[in-house]
UniProtKB/Swiss-Prot annotation:
Keywords: Acetylation, Antiport, Membrane, Methylation, Mitochondrion, Mitochondrion inner membrane, Phosphoprotein, Repeat, S-nitrosylation, Transmembrane, Transmembrane helix, Transport. GO terms for biological process: adaptive thermogenesis; ADP transport; apoptotic mitochondrial changes; heart development; liver development; mitochondrial ADP transmembrane transport; mitochondrial ATP transmembrane transport; negative regulation of cardiac muscle cell apoptotic process. The modification Phosphoserine is found at residues 7, 149-150. This is ADP/ATP translocase 1. The keyword Nucleotide-binding does not apply. Residues 235-240 are annotated as: Important for transport activity. The modification N6-succinyllysine is found at residues 147, 245, 272. The matrix-open state (m-state) is inhibited by the membrane-permeable bongkrekic acid (BKA). The cytoplasmic-open state (c-state) is inhibited by the membrane-impermeable toxic inhibitor carboxyatractyloside (CATR). Proton transporter activity is inhibited by ADP:ATP antiporter activity. GO terms for molecular function: ATP:ADP antiporter activity; enzyme binding; oxidative phosphorylation uncoupler activity; proton transmembrane transporter activity. Belongs to the mitochondrial carrier (TC 2.A.29) family. It comes from Rattus norvegicus. A motif (Nucleotide carrier signature motif) lies at residues 235-240.
């Protein structure tokens, strides 16, 4: 195996392991975030039963659906997240070679910064093409609030993918893809671009204390998450459309979704669950730091 292939494999493994561990840890926060985002577009949650906020959601989920339901959709998320994050990190370094070849970070700061933004955005968009149906299934499973199997819309990952494919075809599994690409480019550009740039400007980037790395990563994930959050809300709402027919369809397209959310719910609706997203971002920051630590040993 060549050095480049070995390096690619190390990136893939380190990124995937770090992601699987952190996503399982923050799965309850992730589910709260998703429910707050999509409840307005859910057929299962009537207006009077909608969650009032993060605390209300955290209290009601175990009472109404059982404690383990906090991890509903987590298996799909881990399966999805392993290749997503691993491919992001692996492709990021490949794109860095393309965008940053021959660039001196100290003498050409803005070109270095722009190159990091481009490599991060391109890495996220590329990996999204491969794993979007899993991301779709994770969202629909997490949004399923039925208590028992008889009340639930889907009985698992395979059932979700099969039902939507039979109903809407491949298009149904890629509902909201275009706005996802827009959001992922903005998020990943900040996530990788600012993180790498900040670390690169330190005196000794390869020997940064883990606390410093975590603080940088925490700031980056919080900012990136808030900036791209409205795109995430719209894509989740579009995902909720798949499997619906006729009068049940809420949005005719992405633009209509943006317009109706702003008009009917107000601009604040684009940021529903955003605070839980900041908390979840601690897991994202942990991924970046853990990835760097794992790479030292593989």
């Amino acid at each position: 195996m060549g050095d480049q292939a070995l390096s690619f494999l190390k990136d893939f493994l380190a990124g995937g392991i770090a992601a699987a561990v952190s996503k399982t840890a923050v799965a309850p926060i992730e589910r709260v975030k998703l429910l707050l985002q999509v409840q307005h577009a859910s057929k299962q949650i009537s207006a009077e039963k909608q969650y009032k906020g993060i605390i209300d959601c955290v209290v009601r989920i175990p009472k109404e659906q059982g404690f383990l339901s906090f991890w509903r959709g987590n298996l799909a998320n881990v399966i999805r997240y392993f290749p997503t994050q691993a491919l992001n990190f692996a492709f990021k370094d490949k794109y860095k070679q393309i965008f940053l070849g021959g660039v001196d970070r100290h003498k050409q700061f803005w070109r270095y910064f722009a190159g990091n933004l481009a490599s991060g955005g391109a890495a996220g968009a590329t990996s999204l093409c491969f794993v979007y149906p899993l991301d779709f299934a994770r969202t629909r499973l997490a949004a399923d609030v039925g208590k028992g199997s008889s009340q639930r819309e889907f009985n698992g990952l395979g059932d979700c993918l099969t039902k939507i494919f039979k109903s809407d075809g491949l298009k149904g599994l890629y509902q909201g893809f275009s706005v996802s690409v827009q959001g992922i480019i903005i998020y990943r550009a900040a996530y990788f671009g600012v993180y790498d740039t900040a670390k690169g400007m330190l005196p000794d980037p390869k020997n940064v204390h883990i606390i410093v790395s975590w603080m940088i990563a925490q700031s980056v994930t919080a900012v990136a998450g808030l900036v791209s959050y409205p795109f995430d809300t719209v894509r989740r709402r579009m995902m909720m459309q798949s499997g619906r027919k006729g009068a049940d369809i809420m949005y005719t397209g992405t633009v209509d979704c943006w317009r109706k959310i702003a008009k009917d719910e107000g601009r604040k609706a684009f940021f529903k669950g955003a605070w839980s997203n900041v908390l979840r971002g601690m897991g994202g920051a942990f991924v970046l730091v853990l990835y760097d630590e794992i790479k030292k040993y593989v």
